[in-house]
Design a protein with these regions (language model features):
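Short glycine/proline/serine/threonine-rich loop/turn segments at secondary-structure transition edges
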Residues: 126-130
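An acidic, gly/pro-interrupted, aromatic-rich
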Residues: 1-101, 105, 132, 136, ...
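Amphipathic alpha-helical segments that form the core helices of the histone-fold
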Residues: 112-123
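Structural motif corresponding to the C-terminal cap of alpha-helices
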Residues: 122-125, 145
Length: 151
């Protein structure tokens, strides 16, 4: 809701009022409308107490990371931020992406293959924008084994 004066102390959650761009470890859950994205990641039934979690369904999780609109939106937002920095070379963008997503720099082989993939995404189709190409790269990085699993 619009407010004439923004007072963070009067709000339940900090961040923008529309909820965009906020990182969170805690989510407000509604019993009647649980987050659909987290259901694939073994979200417990909010209507029942659960002492033990069920086994996870890894194929459903992989499909959620590939197809969920939330994941596509996050990849698109990351691409917009990357493209706004017009002076950076593709290799520099990829190094920054690896640092942000995986906490490390890519090795030479990874940098070469990811640069080739970014170039392939960008040249696949004349209508494909720079943002769409980098969104595809970000989406692919979200689906790497190293991004999904903790060591």
């Amino acid at each position: 809701p619009p407010r004439s004066v923004e007072d963070p102390a009067k709000r339940l959650f900090s961040g923008p009022l529309d909820g965009a761009g906020r990182r969170s470890l805690y989510l407000q859950m509604s019993i009647m409308d649980p987050p659909r994205f987290l259901v694939g990641f073994n979200l417990p039934d909010l209507k029942l107490p659960s002492g033990k979690r069920d086994a996870t369904n890894v194929p459903a999780q992989a499909l959620a990371l590939l197809n969920d609109p939330f994941v596509h939106a996050m990849a698109g937002q990351w691409a917009v931020r990357l493209v706004q920095d017009k002076g950076s070379a593709p290799a520099d963008r990829l190094r920054g992406m690896f640092r942000s997503a995986l906490g490390r720099d890519p090795d030479d082989g990874e940098l070469q293959s990811w640069t080739a993939a970014a170039h392939s995404f960008a040249t696949q189709n004349d209508l494909l924008s720079d943002e769409a190409a980098w969104g595809a790269v970000a989406h692919t990085l979200f689906n790497t084994k190293e991004f999904i699993y903790f060591r």
